């Protein structure tokens, strides 16, 4: 492992780490909105004093975006190993972040403005990802959930499960594992099932446009 790591330039290793940091901060911000931002410049003694409102909503999006931008600028177009991000992975994440950021909110979570400049950035980034030719839609949606098709062309970034690493069940992302259908043998979980109201919200007319 050390030999493989040593072959990658320092900037590329930094980009991988910043991408992962951006990945987790994006998830945390998406869930909680106002979160403390702790990076390498914060001393160990200062961590407990960092406020979750040190940055505005927009500024915090920008802080997270800096990691994705650094990753996009310093990662290769093709990763050396499955599970590592590349420049298009970072651009896809940056596009998703800018899409969220474009819908500007007040402190009560009301949308106060739709930033067209950010939306144009989303279009530019997603076009770059699409035109890379690396991704596409599977011929069968179910393949996205079958192990023999893992890391398929619909997968932008997937945490790889490890085996025989000393842990009880291997390193696995339980946040997504909880989404599998309820089944007696599992005794769980079937989270995040769409309601009929949600389905209705996405109904379209014959012209393909949503019914509001």
Task: Please tell me what each predicted stretch does.
Residues 37, 80-81, 138:
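Secondary-structure boundary/capping residues
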Residues 16, 36, 154-156:
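Beta-sheet entry/capping signal
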Residues 41, 79, 161-163:
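Short, flexible loop/turn elements at secondary-structure junctions
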Residues 69-70, 84-212:
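An aromatic- and glycine-enriched ligand-binding surface/loop that stacks and positions planar moieties
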Residues 1-32, 48-62, 66-82:
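Conserved, well-structured interaction surfaces
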Residues 34-58, 104-123:
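Short coil/linker segments at helix-helix boundaries
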């Amino acid at each position: 492992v050390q030999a493989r790591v040593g072959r990658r330039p320092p900037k590329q290793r930094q980009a991988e780490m910043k991408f992962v940091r951006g990945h987790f901060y994006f998830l945390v911000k998406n869930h909680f909105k106002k979160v403390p931002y702790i990076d390498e410049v914060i001393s160990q003694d200062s961590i407990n004093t960092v406020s979750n409102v040190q940055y505005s909503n927009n500024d915090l999006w920008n802080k997270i975006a800096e990691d994705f931008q650094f990753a996009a600028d310093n990662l290769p177009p093709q990763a050396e190993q499955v599970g590592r991000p590349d420049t298009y992975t970072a651009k896809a994440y940056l596009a998703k972040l800018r899409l969220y950021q474009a819908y500007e909110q007040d402190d009560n979570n009301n949308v106060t403005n739709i930033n067209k400049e950010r939306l144009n950035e989303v279009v530019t980034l997603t076009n770059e990802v699409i035109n890379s030719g690396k991704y596409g839609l599977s011929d069968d949606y179910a393949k996205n959930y079958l192990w023999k098709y893992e890391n398929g062309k619909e997968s932008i970034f997937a945490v790889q499960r490890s085996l025989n690493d000393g842990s009880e069940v291997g390193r696995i992302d339980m946040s997504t594992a909880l989404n599998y259908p309820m089944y007696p043998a599992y005794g769980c979980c079937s989270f995040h099932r769409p309601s009929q109201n949600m389905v209705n919200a996405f109904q379209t007319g014959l012209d393909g446009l949503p019914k509001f």
